[in-house]
Design a protein with these regions (language model features):
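N-terminal Sec-pathway targeting helices
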Residues: 19-39
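Short low-polarity hydrophobic stretches
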Residues: 27-30, 112, 122
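Ser/Thr/Pro/Gly-rich low-complexity linker/stalk segments immediately outside membranes or between
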Residues: 48-76
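Conserved anchor residues at repeat-unit boundaries in beta-strand-based tandem repeats, strongest
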Residues: 67-79, 83-96, 102, 107-118, ...
Length: 288
């Protein structure tokens, strides 16, 4: 007899959990973690900000700048932290002590402007042993000051844009002194040079060399008064020896060269042409 009972269905296998649900759960966890991390970072930055820590960049010119990372005061101006200059040198600044310690070993103590540039009175101690004490303008030595070199030389006078400019006195370690005009770090203009061995020169200079009119007095009593070219007696001048002899005439390369008159204490006199300090030809007499 035919069995009309409803066929039984096979029991279905239990379905595996959908992976997408797991992915959604993992993504939610990661999102929560990221949000927490972001909030923590925001909190840290906010705390740092309210503590007064800032990053500031100041452009000095088209090619130079100063970067600062550190503490600022109530007005937002930096006073303690690290400076990085466009030339690669870095420094630690502490305005509580008015000091900047550079990475190359230099140390500055003195006044600074709001852009952390040396401005006003200050003292610069260089790593090589040189010391400058005086005024600064725009981070450069400018104005009146004293620069002491490690070898014992000392310059006291005017500066501009980091170089000797104007009136000043340079004292050498051996005792020689120059007092007069400077330009672009060199003796330029009128000045007086007194050598340690007793010589003295009063006259004009161009780029550290005697040039133009001057008087040179030698330690032995000789005196030359006349023109100089490239640190040598050249042109017209008068040389008087300590024994009374005298030459008035033309010079070249420190020697009597050209037309001149040589006189002796006895009254003897020679007028003619000289070459490298030697008489070569007497002057022609009138009517010959």
């Amino acid at each position: 007899m035919q069995d009309y009972r409803t066929p039984q269905r096979r029991p279905q296998r239990p379905q595996k959990p959908q992976k997408r649900h797991r992915r959604r759960s993992f993504g939610a966890v990661m999102l929560t973690i990221l949000l927490c991390a972001l909030l923590c970072l925001i909190g840290i930055f906010a705390a740092v900000y309210f503590m007064g820590v800032r990053y500031i960049q100041v452009r000095i010119s088209d090619t130079s700048y100063v970067k600062f990372l550190g503490m600022v005061d109530d007005e937002g101006y930096p006073y303690k932290g690290r400076i990085i200059y466009s030339d690669g040198i870095s420094a630690e600044v502490n305005l509580d002590r008015n000091q900047i310690a550079y990475s190359n070993g230099d140390v500055y103590e003195g006044e600074l402007n709001r852009n952390l540039l040396k401005e006003g009175r200050g003292k610069m101690l260089y790593a090589n042993g040189d010391v400058y004490e005086g005024t600064f303008v725009g981070d450069l030595i400018s104005g009146e000051g004293t620069y002491t070199y490690v070898n014992g030389d000392v310059y006291e006078g005017s500066f501009a844009n980091g170089v000797k400019e104007g009136a000043g006195t340079y004292t050498f370690a051996d005792g020689s002194t120059y007092t007069g005009s400077f330009s672009n770090n060199q003796k330029n203009g009128s000045g007086e040079y007194r050598f340690a061995e007793g010589d003295a020169y009063i006259g004009t200079y161009v780029n550290d060399l005697k040039e133009g009119s001057g008087i040179y007095t030698y330690a032995n009593g000789d005196v030359y008064e006349g023109q100089f070219v490239a640190d040598e007696r050249s042109g017209k001048g008068t040389y008087t020896w300590s024994n009374g002899e005298q030459y008035i005439g033309e010079f070249q390369n420190n020697m009597m060269s050209g037309y001149g008159t040589y006189t002796w204490p006895t009254g003897r006199e020679y007028t003619g042409y000289f070459e490298n300090g030697i008489i070569v030809r007497a002057a022609e007499s009138a009517g010959t």
